[in-house]
Design a protein with these regions (language model features):
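Intracellular juxtamembrane helix-capping segments at the cytosolic ends
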Residues: 100-112, 302-315
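Helix-to-loop junctions at the C-terminal end of transmembrane segments
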Residues: 48-59, 247-261, 345
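Structural signature of the two symmetry-related core transmembrane helices
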Residues: 62-76, 263-278, 358
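Helix-loop-helix hairpin linking two adjacent transmembrane segments in secondary transporters
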Residues: 86, 123-168
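Juxtamembrane intracellular "pre-TM" segments in multi-pass secondary transporters
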Residues: 171-203
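C-terminal transmembrane helical hairpin of 12-TM major facilitator-type secondary transporters
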Residues: 262-307
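Conserved MFS/SLC helix-loop-helix module at the cytosolic interface between two early adjacent transmembrane helices
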Residues: 46-84
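Cytoplasmic helix-loop-helix junction between adjacent transmembrane helices
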Residues: 90-127
Length: 379
């Protein structure tokens, strides 16, 4: 399940090291090609809102395998795309059905013992982050063997293989919920009205993913220009610098199980601000850029798992819907950050990205610091 989670979410991040090549091949601007990242995040957010709650209604194994197969179909459309609109169509389809990751996470929590649910979530969150980061690395490496299109074809084949493996290995599980679909979706919206912890954690998740996307979306542009002028394969290797964040996922899961969620949240909010200090020097310093990547990814993952731990404890019977609500807002943050990053970099360069990052991180620290002490979010 961890591997499937990573492979599915990676589908949304393969384009990032390839943006410069895609822009050149399709004859579009940086701002236009940056829409690819935005569309993938919006598609993922729509899937989280309208598809993930189905895990509380339908048999989970069948739903997971179907969504994996449709994600692969979206990748094939992208790989065959003759123009940007076709690529955006394939990207939207991939993003929509790759939300299967958030059917897998509550399923893992459901199957885990009571005293190990935080670790189970942390394990799949590790797979999620590794997929996001290594997706860039694999993408850059594969593209060096040929066209950027080969990345999409290989990724589609991997997802089909994983879908077959999940069908053979996962247990069947049908929810006892008999609620109709419209009421199911409406209940997700109502949870935001009735659960203050969900509102607070969703906003923190939104801000953290804005920061994550602000950095990663324009990184390929920065590294493909002087003084770096790196190839796609080298740009993809920067995903390895963020692997430290995967370690934070297990650590955060264990802190949640020990009732230290609030401490993990505050540490992550401080680190999200601190990360932009070395990143501010990244325009000319490779060492500073790498340090900033490590701190930013670690902090973002630590906060994400802390948020998930708090949200999952609200009501065990509503895990899929709580997860759907939180993750929808979370990935809307990614879409907003991606859209803003492409535009900011186009007109203000790396200095504009860093300024925006510092401002968003300050908002998160002020809001989050007040919120976690006003509620017993993670206990």
């Amino acid at each position: 399940m961890t591997i499937a989670t990573g492979a599915a979410v990676a589908s949304n991040y393969y384009p990032q090291p390839l943006l410069d090549s895609i822009a050149t091949d399709l004859g579009v601007s940086y701002a236009a090609v940056g829409i690819i990242v935005t569309v993938s995040q919006v598609g993922y957010g729509v899937g989280l809102m309208f598809l993930v709650p189905l895990g509380d209604k339908f048999e989970k194994r069948r739903l997971i395998v179907l969504m994996m197969a449709l994600t692969a179909a979206g990748l094939l459309i992208s790989g065959l795309a003759p123009s940007l609109p076709w690529l955006l169509l394939g990207t939207a389809m991939t993003g929509l059905f790759s939300a299967v990751t958030q059917v897998l996470v509550p399923f893992a929590a459901l199957m885990a013992p009571v005293n190990a649910k935080g670790r189970a979530v942390g394990m799949l969150m590790s797979g999620l982050l590794i997929g996001i980061l290594l997706g860039r690395t694999v993408s850059g490496g594969l593209s060096s063997l040929g066209s950027w299109r080969i990345v999409y074809f290989v990724a589609a084949a991997v997802l089909i293989l994983l879908a077959v493996m999940l069908w053979r290995s996962l247990p069947t599980h049908r929810s006892e919920t008999r609620i109709i679909y419209n009421e199911l979706i409406g209940s997700v919206v109502r949870l935001f009205k009735t659960e203050p912890i969900l509102r607070q954690r969703a906003l923190l998740g939104f801000l953290s993913f804005v920061l994550f996307a602000l950095f990663w979306t324009p990184l390929a542009f920065l590294l493909s220009q002087p003084p770096y002028q790196y190839s796609e394969a080298v740009i993809g290797l920067f995903g390895l610098a963020g692997i430290a964040g995967a370690l934070a996922a297990n650590w955060a899961g264990r802190m949640t199980d020990r009732g230290k969620n609030r401490e993990a949240t505050l540490i992550s909010l401080v680190l999200l601000l601190v990360a932009w200090l070395p990143l501010g020097l990244g325009k000319t310093s490779l060492a500073a850029l790498i340090i900033g990547v490590i701190v930013l990814d670690l902090a973002a993952q630590l906060l994400h798992v802390s948020n998930m731990g708090a949200v999952m404890r609200i009501n065990p019977e509503l895990r899929n819907r709580l997860n759907s609500g939180y993750m929808t807002v979370y990935f809307l943050g990614g879409a907003s950050g991606s859209f803003a990053a492409a535009t900011i970099y186009q007109y203000f360069g790396w200095d504009g990205i860093v300024t925006a990052g510092v401002l968003v991180a300050l908002v998160g620290l002020v809001f989050g610091g007040r919120a976690v002490y006003r509620t017993r979010a993670g206990g």
